[in-house]
Amino acid sequence: KLSLTTPVKKIFEAINSHSSESEIRYVGGCLRKILNNEKVDDIDLATNLNPSEVTEILKKNNINFYESGIEHGTITAIIDDYKYEITSLREDIFTDGRHAKVKFSKDWKKDAARRDFTINSIYADLDGNLFDPYNGKKDIEIGQVSFIGNPEKRIKEDYLRILRYLRFFLNYSKQPHKEEIIKVIKINISGISIISKERLLDELKKLLKSNKLENLSKDKFSIDLILLIFPELKNIKSIIDAIKVKRELFVDLDFMFTLFLMIIDETDNLEYFLYKYNISKKDQKRAYAISNFYNEKNGSKTLNEVNLNKVLYYNGKQAVLDILNFKIIKSKKLDKKMLSLSELYKNKITPSLPVGADLLMTRYQIPEGRQLGSVLKLIEEEWV
């Protein structure tokens, strides 16, 4: 039985009452998580109506929405600040290894057939009655990740499914990799090269968010495959140390920091990764703040309050905590000095330069321009 909220009931009632043939069902991740006793964060819905019919119904029932992926038949409804993606049933009419061209359908079985894995092709109505044409519920129960139909055909439709397979295997599998799937992935791994860097990084982020990341250390096939796709993650086993520290210190290690653990070393690995994946300026600055400490010959000696205060001023509190967490994890032990510094900086406020341009101009009559900037910079350097 599904636990329903009033907002989603409103959407069900609006579409189901449209006509005797209109239907809407839960689909995909929310059902997979419910059946696996996980917390549900997003609710996806599928309907046998086309997008224009869905938008008319939402308007009629005063439900706010926006066209989030209209070319793929997706409308996002918004009720009480919650978002619900409503996607029309589809059939693939063309795939090229990256994208699919679709047509809208009325056939639930055909919509299920175009999905990647059996555990993602489960639907349920308002009362929780399942439509499960590929026995996804059973695969969840026995811990098996199975492609729908021919694995090679499904991978060739979208090569990102290789990385998606690793993510779902990590989260749901209680079985070893099937030899057939290993063989098919090895044959088709080169297809990953046509997938955009943005999609690859987004899928990696989902994989690294797994609460079963520790299992990766026991899965040589998955580690080897990740390194084939992301060769810069050469220190991938660092994430196991990170998980242990996270558990003991109750620290939140976000995606970017987890990435930095795997790519920062004494080589130009970091620079190459940041360039290759077009990482934002903000995250680049964060990475270099860590790297500048890590690459010092006597890194532990530089981790004192004087130098950390400089980082605090120029880069902010997060940069200081990143440096300390990085050092703790890389040392593979809970260093008392590092822990003490970490506690100290958690409560520190980023300082501000007590002298400004206005003071220099009014009290010392320094004219606005290059001279003022130079004097201000000298004062700042001395103060820091």
Q: What are the roles of these predicted feature ranges?
A:
Residues 1-384:
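Catalytic cores of the polymerase beta-like nucleotidyltransferase superfamily
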